[in-house]
């Protein structure tokens, strides 16, 4: 298409069915297949490419977008026909969107069942860390399911306020919403919140998650992640919560950094409590989330906007990715099906090279990698792996009714010994002795191999 304000002038079409080449659609000729896009762009002086097959499979979407990226055209994506019909065919151009990194990654959406509605509909639901990237999306999706009451707990008032205002605008008085500014480290405050609201379901998303920062402040990671989880989980057990869902991470598997080790301890806490509690404690473990606070995508966008360079730690580093809504669908679905002590993991497809992600984002921003925007390799940070794992060998794996969700068998823990060691860890953490603390983590988490100076 050529851009002619306020509308576009459609010049030609392409279709991957060779037999359609030469035909016309409403007077617009089909002049080739997708492989012909670069040549047609040059010959017809095309400025914008409209991607009008949003239901195409992931592999072909990536292939076609890769061809489009070889041109200097602005690439836009049309909504699917269902969206257009739902809108009465009005304002079509306003619904055309830019290509997003998610389109290039091609993540297949998780299909939810009625379990999710059963979990939260008509229930009192508490979300800790409810102002964060995952927590706020949890609140959005829970609110859409019609809870009896939604309680957002967060220490950061600005993010909590933002979610509160968004949900008020969307639901008004139809949603009973309470926002509580509180730290999960404060066991007495946590206890009072549970006594007051008597939640049926708790999603525990509050945590420190930045690997390099937690390497420099391991005592803060332990206080917030480990004992924040301990406080919330104990209150859930005390007040008879039906389900407790811990938001975990693939960095908890064979951890090489403090943050991952603390998240593994969080999993061990809920697995230990599950042995004696009527509350169904489960954990949901997933990889990196696109666009979350502090994740690589916003960082790359900032670096591109500043003219570069885009910093990648290692040319071979790979990560599993999913979108925030996808991650939350997993949490809700798995939380609904879990039994006590289960750890759920997502079939996350193929890992993505961070270098490929950086190059694609530069292209999507209208620049050419290494020419317009430089990519700089900075070296692995302390505790950082080239690749992440999703499951420890001893956990085993079986598929659930959802083909994208798997569950690992609960590990057997001597809960009395475990909680004794946890008490020792707490004493060390609050003495702010970082050296002894890391060793205490190693003693508690047998799979923790601390890579203190891992720059290779």
Regions found by a protein language model. Give the residues of each.
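Strand-loop microenvironment adjacent to phosphate/nucleotide-handling motifs in alpha/beta enzyme folds
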Residues: 115-119, 268-289, 293-456
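Conserved Rossmann-fold NAD(P)-dependent oxidoreductase catalytic core, especially the SDR/UDP-sugar
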Residues: 86-87, 204, 208-267, 272-274
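N-terminal Rossmann NAD(P)H-binding glycine-rich loop of SDR-like oxidoreductase domains
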Residues: 125-143
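A solvent-exposed beta-alpha-beta segment
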Residues: 1-74, 155-162, 169, 177-178, ...
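Conserved Rossmann-fold cofactor-binding substructure of NAD(P)-dependent oxidoreductases
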Residues: 181-201, 383
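Flexible, Lys/Arg-rich cytosolic regulatory linkers and terminal tails that connect or flank
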Residues: 34, 61-124, 237
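Proline-aspartate-enriched helix->loop->beta-strand connector
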Residues: 41, 45-47, 147-148, 194, ...
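NAD(P)-cofactor binding segment of oxidoreductase domains
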Residues: 62-78, 149-156, 196, 201, ...
């Amino acid at each position: 298409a050529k851009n002619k304000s306020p509308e576009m002038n459609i010049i030609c079409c392409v279709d991957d069915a060779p037999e359609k080449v030469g035909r016309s659609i409403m007077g617009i000729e089909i002049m080739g297949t997708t492989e012909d896009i670069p040549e047609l762009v040059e010959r017809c002086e095309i400025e914008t490419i409209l991607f009008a097959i949003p239901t195409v499979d992931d592999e072909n979407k990536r292939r076609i977008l890769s061809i489009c990226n070889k041109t200097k055209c602005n690439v836009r994506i049309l909504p699917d026909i269902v969206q257009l019909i739902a809108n009465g065919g009005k304002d079509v151009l306003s619904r055309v969107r830019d290509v997003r990194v998610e389109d290039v990654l091609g993540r297949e959406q998780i299909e939810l069942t009625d379990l999710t509605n059963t979990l939260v509909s008509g229930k009192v639901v508490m979300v800790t860390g409810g102002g964060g990237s995952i927590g706020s999306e949890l609140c959005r999706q829970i609110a859409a399911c019609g809870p009896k009451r939604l309680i957002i707990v967060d220490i950061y008032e600005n993010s909590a306020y933002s979610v509160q205002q968004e949900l008020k605008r969307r639901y008004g008085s139809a949603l009973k919403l309470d926002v509580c500014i509180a730290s999960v480290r404060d066991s007495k405050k946590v206890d009072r919140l549970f006594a007051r609201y008597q939640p049926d379901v708790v999603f525990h998303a509050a945590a420190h998650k930045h690997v390099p920062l937690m390497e420099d402040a391991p005592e803060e990671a332990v206080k917030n992640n480990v004992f924040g989880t301990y406080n919330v989980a104990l209150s859930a057990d005390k007040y008879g919560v039906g389900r407790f869902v811990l938001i975990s991470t693939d960095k908890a598997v064979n951890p090489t950094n403090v943050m991952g080790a603390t998240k593994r301890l969080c999993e061990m806490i809920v697995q230990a409590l599950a042995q004696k509690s009527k509350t169904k404690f489960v954990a949901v473990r997933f990889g990196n989330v696109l666009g979350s606070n502090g994740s690589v995508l916003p960082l790359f966008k900032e670096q591109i906007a500043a003219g570069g360079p885009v910093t990648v730690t290692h040319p071979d580093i790979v990560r599993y990715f999913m979108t925030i809504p996808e991650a939350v669908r997993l949490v809700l679905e798995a939380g609904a099906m879990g039994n006590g002590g289960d750890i759920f993991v997502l079939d996350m497809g193929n890992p993505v090279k961070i270098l490929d992600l950086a190059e694609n984002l530069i292209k999507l921003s209208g620049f050419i990698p290494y020419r317009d925007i430089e990519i700089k390799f900075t070296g692995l940070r302390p505790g950082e792996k080239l690749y992440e794992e999703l499951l420890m060998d001893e956990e085993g794996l079986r598929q659930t009714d959802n083909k994208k969700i798997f569950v690992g068998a609960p590990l057997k823990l001597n809960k009395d010994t475990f909680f004794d060691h946890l008490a020792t860890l707490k004493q060390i953490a609050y003495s702010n002795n970082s050296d002894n603390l890391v060793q205490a983590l190693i003693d508690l988490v047998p799979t923790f191999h601390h890579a203190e100076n891992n720059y290779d």
